């Protein structure tokens, strides 16, 4: 019993040390990447696509930070689900009066037996005017007005996908600290593997890819029956070490 009582803490300590070294290595890799990555100089026109559901308050809070990005030519397309208890349409109409680059449409109630998120993204892509598509979500807000410029510096001629960093906003409370830490570790693993040349997933809160890549893959046809997968499964299918770049600035 004494040996067991000694062995368990020792094993836990070794495991903790291994995990710590692993994550410190990931952090170092991300830091070095941010200091040494080669940047593109073009600012191609962009289409930002969001799909909203019961998100009127989130759009009212976060959409201005997206629409007021310091970037020469971009459009914002919001596709929302019709809902009797949501004011998305009113919020978007109000913003459209101020921002001429905002476009919006809705997913009809008759759309059934298909993921509304994937349908909304598909509608947004078909409505878009530009080759480069940037994706985020209504409950997300860029950390500055340079978000699009930082993403666009990765849009080189041999790049099809850009995976961006995202995390939760820090507020008081144990639960927020825990989920923020977990999301940080997840992002480090995801982006770290991509930097190594082995991208395997993406996060719909902050990523970009070419419209032509979407059509070449025939959209989400291979997993259309699944409710999710519009970001992680799609990126897993199309991302390669040679066509994917990473942006670590939020």
Features from the language model and the residues they span:
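Acidic donor-binding segment of Leloir-type glycosyltransferases
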Residues: 63-111
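Short beta-strand-to-loop acidic/aromatic patch adjacent to the donor-nucleotide binding site
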Residues: 130-141
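Acidic donor-binding loop at a coil-to-helix junction in glycosyltransferase catalytic cores
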Residues: 226-233
């Amino acid at each position: 019993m004494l040996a067991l009582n000694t062995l368990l803490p020792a094993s836990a300590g070794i495991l903790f040390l291994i995990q710590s070294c692993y994550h410190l290595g990931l952090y170092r890799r991300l830091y070095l990447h941010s200091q040494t990555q080669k940047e593109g100089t073009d600012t191609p026109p962009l289409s930002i696509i969001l799909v909203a559901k019961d998100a009127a308050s989130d759009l009212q809070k976060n959409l201005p930070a997206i629409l007021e990005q310091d970037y020469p030519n971009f459009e914002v397309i919001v596709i929302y689900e019709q809902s009797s208890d949501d004011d998305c349409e009113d919020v978007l109409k109000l913003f459209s009066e101020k921002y001429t680059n905002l476009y919006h449409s809705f997913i009809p109630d008759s759309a059934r037996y298909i993921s509304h998120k994937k349908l909304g993204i598909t509608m947004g892509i078909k409505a878009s005017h530009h080759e480069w598509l940037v994706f985020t979500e209504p409950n997300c807000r860029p950390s500055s007005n340079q978000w699009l410029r930082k993403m666009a510096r990765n849009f080189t001629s041999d790049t099809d996908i850009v995976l961006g960093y995202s995390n939760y906003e820090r507020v008081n409370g144990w639960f927020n600290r825990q989920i923020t830490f977990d999301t940080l570790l997840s992002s480090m693993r995801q982006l770290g593997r991509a930097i190594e040349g082995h991208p395997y997933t993406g996060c719909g809160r902050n990523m970009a890819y070419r419209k032509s890549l979407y059509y070449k893959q025939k959209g989400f046809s291979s997993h259309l029956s699944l409710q999710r997968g519009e970001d992680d499964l799609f990126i897993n299918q199309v991302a390669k070490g040679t066509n994917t770049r990473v942006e670590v600035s939020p």
